[in-house]
Design a protein with these regions (language model features):
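N-terminal hydrophobic/helix-forming segments and targeting peptides
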Residues: 1-160, 173, 193-197
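Short acidic, Gly/Ser-rich segments with clustered Asp/Glu that frequently serve as metal-coordination loops
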Residues: 159-167
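Acidic/histidine-rich catalytic neighborhood of metal-dependent amide-processing enzymes
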Residues: 166-202
Length: 202
């Protein structure tokens, strides 16, 4: 319409196939993930809005809804981190943002360059010496089960702006240089998801 707002009504009971209990939530989840856009620094944002009304005879299940909402928040947080330009999300800022995840129940430990040297993490420190920014190792912990349960561990590399090693990358690849921290961003999004869902895992 003239206001840039579209409305869709979906009546799930008219679908002539047997749907599993969380199929409706999966459908909405997919729509929300598809609607992601990183427009934080755009002066003119897309004003178009799509409102979806899901009509069903089945009772609303908040537990299932919250599960998919937590997944969405984790995925989109990862996308936000990867999409940030290198002059904004440098190692100092990245470590600062990860520290803020304490608010959702994660245990966050940040080790700076001085501590890394004591720990013998010389390869990590060596890579970081190519930047005026600090080097950090950040651990995120979620304990949703008994303390004696075996933990799952995920490791991700977080080079915020990778210009190359022995050979510098040409300028035409500059927009991709922030993607070298995507591995760590995926781990961060996963940990946020686990914490928001109160997952029974360590």
């Amino acid at each position: 319409n003239s206001e840039g707002i579209g409305v869709i009504h979906i009546v799930s009971d008219t679908i002539s196939i047997n749907l599993k209990p969380d199929a409706i939530y999966e459908f909405l989840h997919g729509m929300r993930l598809k609607s992601y856009s990183f427009d934080r620094y755009k002066s003119k944002k897309d004003s178009k809005t799509l409102k979806v009304n899901m009509i069903s005879s089945k009772k609303f299940n908040k537990k299932i809804y919250d599960k998919f909402k937590a997944i969405e928040l984790g995925v989109n947080y990862t996308k936000d981190l990867v999409s940030e330009p290198g002059n904004i999300l440098h190692p100092d800022e990245y470590a600062k943002r990860l520290s803020q995840l304490k608010k959702i129940g994660l245990k966050v430990s940040v080790y700076d360059e001085k501590q890394l040297k004591k720990m013998g993490c010389n390869a990590l420190v060596g890579v970081g010496q190519g930047s005026i920014r600090g080097s950090y190792l950040v651990t995120l912990e979620w304990r949703g089960k008994k303390s004696n349960s075996k933990p799952l561990a995920f490791v991700g590399k977080g080079v915020c702006f990778d210009t190359g090693g022995i050979s510098l990358k040409p300028a035409r690849f500059m927009e991709d240089m922030t993607y070298d921290m995507a591995g760590s961003a995926v781990v961060v999004g996963l940990m946020k998801n686990l914490a928001l869902r109160k997952s029974k895992v360590n």
